[in-house]
């Protein structure tokens, strides 16, 4: 997805910013990038296409505020992770004062599917108010932890039972939504789906 986005805007470098709190993720991504290089899918004149593209993996020490795009850019540049005044916007003057597109991994993960199947097909996925798909991370509290992509509107119980293969230990509640998420008691799980409507 990042390579396709880079091609669309004429970029030759994609920066993968991964927080240091996730060392295993950093290593997995570095191995994936090395594998792409070994297969000739990144670098100069990729597969004789005339297209150049490289990935730079950054193990970031940034604080939570670095989730904001301009604070993230400051962190990558080795500066304090503080929000920048706008304008200029990153697309005008971003990383090292060059035009920069900033997206999260979930957005970029959708790009290949959208390119292959079309935006209209992607918009038909999900519910009326929550289109597309979502990435769901299941931790070691599940029998089969991992990251899964599900269509918006998928019942939360189905995610737990079919993808996570149930809980690995007795569970009273789930923490959903990352640092700014909430605690959901097990009695509410069957009323929820992976969408914006049921979580309001």
Predicted regions and their residues:
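Active-site loop ensemble at the mouth of alpha/beta enzyme cores that anchors a bound cofactor
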Residues: 75-87, 187-200
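Terminal amphipathic helices with adjacent charged low-complexity linkers/tails
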Residues: 13-33, 55, 167-199
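Hydrophobic alpha-helical positions that pack around
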Residues: 26-152, 164-166
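Internal alpha/beta scaffold segment
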Residues: 1-25, 96, 103, 109, ...
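Short amphipathic, charge-patterned alpha-helical segments
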Residues: 1-5, 152-168
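Glycine-rich nucleotide phosphate-binding loop and flanking beta-alpha elements
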Residues: 80, 156, 182
């Amino acid at each position: 997805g990042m390579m396709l986005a880079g091609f669309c805007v004429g970029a030759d470098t994609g920066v993968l910013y991964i927080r240091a709190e996730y060392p295993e993720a950093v290593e997995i991504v570095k191995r994936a990038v090395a594998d792409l290089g070994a297969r000739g899918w990144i670098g100069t004149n990729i597969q004789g296409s005339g297209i150049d593209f490289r990935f730079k993996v950054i193990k970031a020490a940034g604080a939570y505020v670095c989730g904001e795009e301009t604070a993230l850019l400051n962190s990558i540049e080795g500066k304090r992770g503080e929000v920048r005044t706008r304008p200029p916007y990153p697309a005008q003057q971003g990383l090292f004062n060059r035009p920069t597109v900033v997206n999260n991994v979930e957005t970029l993960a959708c790009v290949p599917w959208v390119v292959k199947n079309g935006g209209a097909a992607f918009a038909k996925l999900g519910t009326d108010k929550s289109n597309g798909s979502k990435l769901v991370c299941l931790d070691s509290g599940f029998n089969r932890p991992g990251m899964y992509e599900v269509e918006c509107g998928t019942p939360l119980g189905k995610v737990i039972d079919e993808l996570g293969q149930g809980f690995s230990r007795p569970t009273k509640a789930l923490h959903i939504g990352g640092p700014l998420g909430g605690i959901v008691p097990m009695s509410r799980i069957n009323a929820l789906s992976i969408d914006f409507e049921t979580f309001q």
